[in-house]
Every structure is written in C-alpha cells, then in structure tokens.
Amino acid sequence: MNVLVINSGSSSIKYQLFAMPEAKVLAKGLLEKIGEEISALKHTAVEKGKEKKIEQKVADHKAGMSLIFSLLTDKEVGVIADMNEISAVGHRVVHGGEAFNKSILITDEAIKAIEACCDIAPLHNPAGLQGISACKEILKDVKMVGVFDTSFHQTIPDYAYMYAVPHEWYDKYKIRRYGFHGTSHKYVYGEFCKVTNKPNANVIVCHLGNGASVTAVKNGESIDTSMGLTPLEGLVMGTRSGDMDPAVPTFVMAKENLSAKEMDNILNKKSGLLGVSGVSNDMRNLEEAAKTNPKAELAITMFCYRVKKYIGAYMAALGHLDGIVFTGGIGENSAYIRGRILEGLDELGIKCDADKNSKARGCANFEKDGAAIKLYVIATDEEKAIAMDTYNLAK
C-alpha cells in the first residue's frame, strides 16, 4: 500500500511517497515559490537514485499537485505506473484546535472544523486546506487523513492550558494553550521508550529548530508544552520572540505607531535569534559569528538559558524524570548547543558526557555512565509518523 504525505505551506508543498507498512520512502520532493513568476521543484526517486529539478510558473496548489503527480508517474523519475497506486494521502495540518485529539479521516465536517481554526492559525491552516482541496480534486475517491500538530497536546490539563485572563475569552474565542510540534514530540517519545525499554516513561522532549518547543510527557501523555495559542510563545526561536512581557508590544506600538499586524510580523519574523543578533536566524551561522560578535553570543546564550529554564520547570511538573531527548535541526546536529543547555545541571541528576555528546547522531545516548536520567539525541521523522497514522486509518 502506497501512502503520499503532503505538507502544504502558504507557497510550498513538501511531499514523500511511502510503501507501507514498512515505511520505505519511494520518492520525495519540495515545490517552492508557488504563485511567483518562477517556482522551483526538486524531486528525488529514492531507489532509482535519480533527481529532477524543474523551474516554471506554478500558479496555485492545484497546479503544484498536478506537477508533483506527473513526476511520481514519470517514465524517467517516477516510482509508480499511475495514480491508482496511491491508496491514501496524509496531510499535515498545523492547528486542530479542540476539535481533534488524534489523527482523523478527512470528511466535509472535518474540513469545516479545520476552517474554523483559520482565525488562530492564519499563516498555516489555509495552506493546509489548499493542499487537501487540490488532492481531493485530482485524486477524487482516495482516502485523505489529517494529522494535527496540536492533537498530541490535547491531554494537557486545564490548569496548564488556560491563561490567567478573563474566562469569557476562552468561552468566546477558545483562547488557551494548544502547543505545536506534537507529531514530532510524540514520535521521538515513542522512539525513546523503545530504545530504553521503558514504556510510559517520563520524558522532556526538546524539539529545537528554527521553530522550537519543549514538551513534558508523563506516562505517554503531554502534560505541558512551551508553545501556546500560536507557535510564538515559549523558547527563543529563529525569528520568533518566545516568552516576553505582554506589555512590550503595546508599549512599542504606541511609541512607533505600529498596527497590530505590523507588530505580529515583527514578533514572528524579525525577532528571536535574528532580532537579538542582527546577524542570522540560523544557529550554525551564529555559532561561527559568536567568535567575534557579542550580540551573536548573547543570542545563543539566551536561547540555551530559555531551554534550560523549561527543563527545570518541567522536571518540577513531572515529579520524576527518566530522560531528556533532543531533536529537530539544532537538537540533532549541534553538540555545542546541547552541551550549553545541560551545563551545570549535574546537581539535578542531569549529567552530560562531553565525549559521547560530541559523537551523538541519529539515535544515541550521551549521559555519563551510571546516570539515572538518560540523555538522547533522536532524529525526528514527522513524515514517517504521518504515514503510519494514515496507513492505520486508511487500511
């Protein structure tokens, strides 16, 4: 059974075709700059070892999906004979609100519920809906599955997800913590439990990339997470501010005569590591720049300090901790950042072995010998997780 996984952005489509249930990747690709004068698509037929790059105008998501399907069935770089060989499509949907606590088969009712969340996810949900609509038009009767970034966090208790603001805001607008990166947090937590042979372990998962979040998982359930109503809350991120005094935006808006939309854009796209350093939102660039640039060093220190604080807070929330897992682009690839975050936590039982840490890749532990709290790097695979959920619902 072949499952196509789609991740639709506002101007991009990322895709992978899996042979299930073994989760073997047959083909993958990325289409960018949809709607611009020249769009770019990079397609790889994995087993054939063949790659094709296309640059042409792609007007919208439907045209993009048509182009992707033509490559999947192409004589040279295709991996299937025709579209009938696709049994199901799994869609990443960023925000499911309170409507979805697990992955679902997409129905007309489900689409309405996803549309209802566009208010609180204006950057992401409309794009996801465009991908769903394009696939439904082209593939007609093929089963579609929605996998939500928020659903894993629906187990968070009310005292952790409610904000201390007038309750009517929740009643009217469902203002609360939702959390994101749920598919990644759930996947790497499951991998940790497998490799340590500790089912239902208590784990802190640090998904650190351009977007970053920390989740406390107790007995297999998310009990708290750093992102909030939107992905803007929590850690210092590539271009997002993370936690701050809510009075700051209104103060600066008055001083600079900024609209709410302008301030939202600054906090989401011009803050975080980029805003503090003035250099880059990319941690690799900052690690290099920090050798001579104090602002780059400050940005790194703020990033690591914020993660460290969340680890301490979530240790308190969990009561007992079995392990800490690092994943995401930074979490998986920067031993330096992992080391900085875990520095000085020995008294809490968190003991990082510097030598093991420097070599940790893919799936590897790096705590000191005999330490009770396990430290792991585990590569995330959200596409595989989406494919598994899609297969289980559609088979």
From Swiss-Prot:
<dbReference type="GO" id="GO:0005524">
    <property type="term" value="F:ATP binding"/>
</dbReference>
<keyword id="KW-0067">ATP-binding</keyword>
<dbReference type="GO" id="GO:0005737">
    <property type="term" value="C:cytoplasm"/>
</dbReference>
<keyword id="KW-0808">Transferase</keyword>
<comment type="subunit">
    <text>Homodimer.</text>
</comment>
<feature type="binding site">
    <location>
        <position position="92"/>
    </location>
    <ligand>
        <name>substrate</name>
    </ligand>
</feature>
<feature type="binding site">
    <location>
        <position position="14"/>
    </location>
    <ligand>
        <name>ATP</name>
    </ligand>
</feature>
<comment type="function">
    <text>Catalyzes the formation of acetyl phosphate from acetate and ATP. Can also catalyze the reverse reaction.</text>
</comment>
<keyword id="KW-0460">Magnesium</keyword>
<dbReference type="InterPro" id="IPR023865">
    <property type="entry name" value="Aliphatic_acid_kinase_CS"/>
</dbReference>
<dbReference type="InterPro" id="IPR000890">
    <property type="entry name" value="Aliphatic_acid_kin_short-chain"/>
</dbReference>
<dbReference type="GO" id="GO:0008776">
    <property type="term" value="F:acetate kinase activity"/>
</dbReference>
<dbReference type="Pfam" id="PF00871">
    <property type="entry name" value="Acetate_kinase"/>
</dbReference>
<feature type="binding site">
    <location>
        <position position="7"/>
    </location>
    <ligand>
        <name>Mg(2+)</name>
    </ligand>
</feature>
<keyword id="KW-0963">Cytoplasm</keyword>
<feature type="binding site">
    <location>
        <position position="382"/>
    </location>
    <ligand>
        <name>Mg(2+)</name>
    </ligand>
</feature>
<keyword id="KW-0547">Nucleotide-binding</keyword>
<feature type="binding site">
    <location>
        <begin position="282"/>
        <end position="284"/>
    </location>
    <ligand>
        <name>ATP</name>
    </ligand>
</feature>
<protein>
    <recommendedName>
        <fullName>Acetate kinase</fullName>
        <ecNumber>2.7.2.1</ecNumber>
    </recommendedName>
</protein>
<dbReference type="GO" id="GO:0006085">
    <property type="term" value="P:acetyl-CoA biosynthetic process"/>
</dbReference>
<keyword id="KW-0418">Kinase</keyword>
<feature type="active site" description="Proton donor/acceptor">
    <location>
        <position position="149"/>
    </location>
</feature>
<comment type="similarity">
    <text>Belongs to the acetokinase family.</text>
</comment>
<feature type="binding site">
    <location>
        <begin position="329"/>
        <end position="333"/>
    </location>
    <ligand>
        <name>ATP</name>
    </ligand>
</feature>
<feature type="binding site">
    <location>
        <begin position="207"/>
        <end position="211"/>
    </location>
    <ligand>
        <name>ATP</name>
    </ligand>
</feature>
<keyword id="KW-0479">Metal-binding</keyword>
<comment type="pathway">
    <text>Metabolic intermediate biosynthesis; acetyl-CoA biosynthesis; acetyl-CoA from acetate: step 1/2.</text>
</comment>
<dbReference type="InterPro" id="IPR004372">
    <property type="entry name" value="Ac/propionate_kinase"/>
</dbReference>
<dbReference type="InterPro" id="IPR043129">
    <property type="entry name" value="ATPase_NBD"/>
</dbReference>
<feature type="site" description="Transition state stabilizer">
    <location>
        <position position="181"/>
    </location>
</feature>
<dbReference type="GO" id="GO:0006083">
    <property type="term" value="P:acetate metabolic process"/>
</dbReference>
<feature type="site" description="Transition state stabilizer">
    <location>
        <position position="240"/>
    </location>
</feature>
<dbReference type="GO" id="GO:0000287">
    <property type="term" value="F:magnesium ion binding"/>
</dbReference>
